[in-house]
């Protein structure tokens, strides 16, 4: 789910395995969109401690499953990335803390048309819980830019996702979905800036990953444009269960050229 500008916020939800829901969309006010939540450095450090819990402990003699976080090289420890728009932290979501804000964004009419998570908070909560209760192959994150929460991200193992049935996946392909929350932040190129920076952060923090992939809805022209501006290339059209998608790829070998 990746968008750009006005639709980088509303486009790339699809393949994390969570069920899709629809519901009435409400139109947030401008004041609601720009919730002034600023986080101190100490609080940001506290938030980044979320994702290190280990899972998969088994009795002696049994093979253990991957520890929570290993499938994405411990995303919670990646640290901030400096972008032309400011310093961005990807902070793994805590449901009880971020649900009201993320649900508020999902009820924006433009966002709802692509993410299909409008409605009461329970709709968004179910989507988040599916990822949070999993094995760490998909990590929902809050994007905090210069201390202000302003975007929602899903970083996921595309090669382990249902998306892999619809394109020639390679081991460790990593997918990205982006929603820019505040309406005032859309339509001015911010999506492309953040997508490029996060894609390169993924490639820097995941040495085994050769490609970052995305599958925005083909109808979401601003989102597709943002990916192209962010150094992704259009690879193919993909007929997914919930949409016809543009398969976008950012290659490690080509990132200095695009």
Predicted regions and their residues:
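C-terminal "cap" of GNAT-fold acetyltransferases
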Residues: 240-258
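Conserved acetyl-CoA-binding loop-helix of GNAT-fold acetyltransferases
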Residues: 187-202, 225
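Conserved beta-strand-loop-alpha-helix junction that forms the acyl-donor binding cleft
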Residues: 212-224, 241-242
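Conserved active-site alpha-helix within GNAT-family acetyltransferase domains
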Residues: 218-236
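Acetyl-CoA-dependent GNAT
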Residues: 130-171, 183
């Amino acid at each position: 789910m990746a968008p750009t500008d006005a639709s980088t916020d509303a486009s790339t939800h699809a393949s994390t395995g969570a069920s899709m829901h629809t519901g009435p969309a409400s139109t947030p006010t401008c004041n609601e969109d720009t919730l002034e939540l600023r986080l101190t450095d100490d609080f940001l450090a506290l938030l980044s401690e979320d994702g290190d819990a280990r899972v998969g402990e088994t009795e002696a003699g049994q093979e253990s499953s991957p520890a929570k976080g290993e499938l994405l090289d411990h995303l919670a420890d990646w640290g901030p990335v400096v972008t032309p728009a400011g310093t961005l932290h990807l902070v793994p979501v805590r449901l009880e803390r971020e649900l009201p804000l993320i649900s508020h964004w999902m009820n924006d009419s433009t966002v709802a048309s692509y993410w299909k998570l409008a409605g009461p908070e329970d709709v968004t909560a179910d989507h988040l819980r599916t990822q949070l209760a999993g094995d760490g192959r998909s990590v929902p994150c809050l994007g905090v830019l210069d201390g202000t929460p302003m975007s929602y991200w899903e970083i996921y193992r595309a090669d382990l996702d249902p998306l892999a049935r619809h394109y020639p996946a390679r081991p460790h392909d990593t997918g990205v979905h982006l929603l820019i929350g505040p309406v005032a932040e859309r339509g001015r190129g911010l999506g492309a800036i953040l997508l490029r920076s996060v894609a390169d952060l993924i490639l820097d923090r995941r040495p085994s990953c050769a490609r970052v992939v995305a599958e925005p809805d083909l109808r979401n022209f601003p989102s597709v444009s943002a990916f192209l501006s962010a150094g992704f290339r259009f690879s193919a059209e993909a007929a997914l269960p919930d949409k016809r998608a543009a398969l976008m790829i950012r290659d490690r070998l080509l990132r200095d050229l695009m």
